[in-house]
Each structure stands twice: as structure tokens, then as C-alpha cells.
């Protein structure tokens, strides 16, 4: 009876267009299903977008240190771990989302990863340590993307040749980037624009 109830709930969610799980599309955990936090305002990156993104990142993701700054479902960070990332730091202000990511990591028998219940900008005011890859998928129309990008660049959060992935509303056009960032890839999936950005060393870094 409980199984029938669960299937009925899942069917209603599917008809309503509400996702209650996502699928890891590549790597060690390919095909594994991941539950989403109930009640949390989450917009997971679609399968086909993640597949394209990690094709872009394929040369660098193994052994990389990654930051999933607006983690939500954790889809991007989990995909990175599945494909060999050394570490992913997950940050989200919704405790339900972080608890679900913790449960997912445990279910996957993954190594322990840093999990932070925190506003993204508050997190970036802390002590910085450089990341090789950063995932930036803030809520659309929140105004957080520009501020987060500036803090990542100015406060020492990025390795010299870091890659930054950005998702934003396609209607807003390409994101405004710090001067040291260069747009390398750009694609669209429905109303979502998604971008891969390369960081170049600043002049003061090159002099060291």
C-alpha cells in the first residue's frame, strides 16, 4: 500500500511538472537517482545541460577542487564528484537542501564533503581558499550573480586558471563578467542560458 501511495504521489508530481528526483548522468554514479529536498525552492540543472557542461569540463574535472555556491539540489557538485573531482564544497542557505545533499552523499557512500548552510555572499566574506572550478547557479532575478562573481574574483577564491560555470535567465543575455574573466562557451536550453567562463591571471598575480 505504501509503495502504491508513493507511486501515486510521484505521478501527480510529474503531471504537475514538479521534479522530486534527478539522475546523475555520468561517471562512477551514472544512472543513480538522487532525491530532492521536499519543500525547498530548487531548480535542478537539466540532464542534457549537465551532460554538455561536463563534456566541456572533461579535461579538467578529475582531481579538481570545486565550489557549488548556490547548491540547491547539489546536482552540479554531485556530478563533479561522480566524474572524479577531488573535493566539492556545497553552500546553500536552505538547511533542507544541505540535509538532503548530506543524505545523498551518505547513500552514495561518497567521502565526506564540506557542507555549509549559509547565504552565498556571507560565505564569500570568510577566509578564502582557491577553487579550480566554481558552479554559479543563483536564483534568477535575484541580483546575486554580479556580486558573487566580483567577490570570487576579488577575495582570492579562484585558482589562477579557474573555470566558472554560470546559469542565468536567457532573456537577461550573457552575464556581465569581471575584467579577468573570458566567456568561452555559451548555450541555451529553453529559457535558461548557460555559460563556461575562463579566468585569466591578473597582472599582480603574473608578477609573483
Regions picked out by a protein language model, each given a short descriptive name:
Residues 1-208:
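Class I S-adenosyl-L-methionine-dependent methyltransferase catalytic core
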